[in-house]
Design a protein with these regions (language model features):
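Acidic carboxylate diad motif detector
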Residues: 1-41
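Substrate-contacting helices/loops that form the catalytic groove of nucleic-acid
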Residues: 33-37, 43-155
Length: 155
């Protein structure tokens, strides 16, 4: 990490060198000793630098005294012991039309061409969006269940 904290230099002999950092997170807030790990991650939407930071995270929650049992299924996302059923959002089925169009565009391009590569990038971004929607939905539901109950039993 450079002294201005606007760039990072990789010295692991992979030939990456110096990269400029762009983003919303303020790295001035963390000291160099708190940064434990740095990773380069390539996704369909671009290349990202991930920082692993050693921070104690504490949340003050009051015990609610509630217990709940969850049954995860295929038709419903989950059913709890109180009779509440959460429907499966089916993000893949909702965006099926867009994915079909992207697949058709790829199949019409010449193999090895720049335009086929661009079409593959677009399809990759669509799949990445679906996976992020699924992950976001799962995290939000899990957080809601965990915060509102003290004991959770999963079948």
């Amino acid at each position: 990490m450079a002294n201005d904290r606007k760039s990072i230099k990789f010295t692991d002999k992979k030939g990456i060198g110096k990269l400029k950092l762009k983003g919303t997170r303020d790295l001035h807030f963390y000291s160099f000793s708190q940064i434990k790990r740095v990773r380069l991650v390539r996704r369909a939407s671009g290349v990202y630098v991930q920082f692993g930071i050693d921070v104690d995270r504490k949340e003050n929650t009051e015990p609610s005294g509630n217990t709940i049992g969850l049954d995860v299924g295929l038709k419903e996302y989950y059913t709890d012991s109180n009779g509440v059923m959460v429907e499966n959002p089916k993000f893949l089925l909702r965006s099926k039309k867009v994915l079909k169009r992207c697949q058709r565009r790829i199949s019409r391009k010449v193999k090895g061409s720049k335009n086929r590569g661009k079409a593959r990038q677009i399809l990759g971004k669509r799949h990445l969006k679906i996976s992020r929607q699924r992950k976001d939905h799962a995290i939000k539901l899990a957080r809601c269940v965990v915060q509102s109950n003290d004991l959770i039993a999963v079948r």
